[in-house]
């Protein structure tokens, strides 16, 4: 059972630079590059060989008219002629914000990454100091979710997957960019539209939305989930203590398909709004009860052994 309504509240705010994680690095698609095992601040193996190497200052900005990014950047400088293995030689690396390198005169490829955004440019170093600014044309996306009444969801059960917006013509699927993004984390992305899948809990509360990221801005998007938390109890009488060692199955009432199975006295789960059937097995006895999940209204479903017992043929 899946909610069909999609409500997305989007707010654009000024983009603030935060440190990017190492796993956010993307490779240049059209170049064969080596993969360094570690990054050292402003290292250049050629600098010590030439005391007259000019200083090259590298800056990165989200847009052409924005201030330089002050953190979270990864810089790699490559030579322009492939080595014997077909890869471009790595000349220097650096992390952080703007960086200053000493490079011998010549041509270089500069590759910059900031989260999932990246850019590359070619520079020509002469005998004089050089300052180069790379424009990333990137922004940020910060995801969250809420219930229909505006209250917060349980963030520890909320996760997002970010996909490319366009469907691949060959596979018929979208390309996954970043899985399992937690709520509240800013993801750095190139400007563009992205397809976001929000999953609340691990069963069937899933909402999709297309969101636009603008360069130089952080897009704050809150997706509305029509779901609630459900706790199951099997009791001998009203007000009784839940029976342990109970095996549970939860069925979609409209299809009869099992959507969750669990064992315990009071299993808890998040379900999309809709109609369901709970089946409990305890010591070879079966019990069954229908229940309804309303968006944003957590509920405890109690099955009494003296009212809801069924034979095995009527359990589903």
Ranges and model annotations:
Residues 54-64, 141-149, 229-238:
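A short, amphipathic beta-strand motif
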Residues 23-45, 95, 114-137, 201-224, ...:
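Structured interaction patches on ligand/partner-binding surfaces of diverse proteins
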Residues 64-84, 148-172, 237-257:
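Short, ordered, surface-exposed loop/turn motifs in non-cytosolic proteins
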Residues 1-8:
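Bacterial N-terminal signal peptides that target proteins for export
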Residues 8-15:
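Bacterial N-terminal signal peptides
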Residues 80-97, 167-183, 252-265:
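Short, acidic Ser/Thr/Gly-rich low-complexity loop/linker segments typical of extracellular
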Residues 18-22:
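Sec/Tat signal peptide C-region and signal peptidase I cleavage site
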Residues 95-107, 114-116, 180-203, 266-277, ...:
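Short Pro-Gly-centered beta-turn/loop motif in secreted/extracellular proteins
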């Amino acid at each position: 059972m899946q909610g069909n309504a999609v409500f997305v509240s989007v707010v654009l705010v000024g983009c603030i630079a935060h440190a990017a994680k190492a796993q956010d690095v993307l490779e240049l698609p059209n170049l064969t590059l080596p993969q360094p095992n570690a990054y050292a601040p402003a290292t250049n193996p050629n600098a010590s060989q030439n005391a007259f190497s000019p200083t090259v200052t590298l800056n990165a900005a989200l847009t052409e008219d924005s201030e330089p990014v002050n953190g979270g950047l990864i810089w790699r400088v490559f030579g322009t002629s492939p080595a014997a293995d077909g890869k471009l030689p790595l000349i220097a690396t650096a992390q952080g914000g703007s960086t200053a390198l000493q490079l011998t005169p010549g041509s270089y490829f500069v590759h910059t990454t900031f989260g999932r955004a990246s850019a590359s440019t070619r520079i020509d170093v002469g005998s004089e100091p050089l300052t180069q600014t790379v424009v990333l044309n990137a922004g940020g996306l910060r995801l969250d979710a809420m219930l229909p009444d505006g209250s917060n969801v349980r963030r520890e059960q909320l996760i997002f997957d970010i996909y490319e917006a366009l469907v691949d013509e060959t596979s018929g699927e979208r390309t996954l960019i970043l899985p399992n993004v937690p709520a509240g984390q800013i993801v750095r992305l190139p400007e563009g539209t992205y397809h976001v899948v929000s999953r609340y809990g691990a069963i069937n509360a899933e909402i999709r939305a297309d969101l636009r990221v603008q360069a130089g801005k952080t897009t704050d998007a809150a997706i509305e989930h029509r779901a609630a938390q459900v706790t199951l109890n099997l009791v001998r009488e009203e007000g009784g203590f839940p029976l342990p060692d109970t095996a549970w199955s939860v069925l979609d009432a409209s299809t009869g398909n099992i959507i969750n199975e669990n064992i315990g006295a009071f299993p808890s789960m998040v379900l999309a709004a809709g109609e369901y059937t709970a089946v409990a097995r305890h010591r070879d006895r079966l019990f069954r009860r229908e229940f309804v999940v309303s968006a944003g209204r957590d509920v405890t479903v109690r099955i009494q052994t003296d009212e809801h017992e069924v034979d095995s043929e009527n359990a589903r």
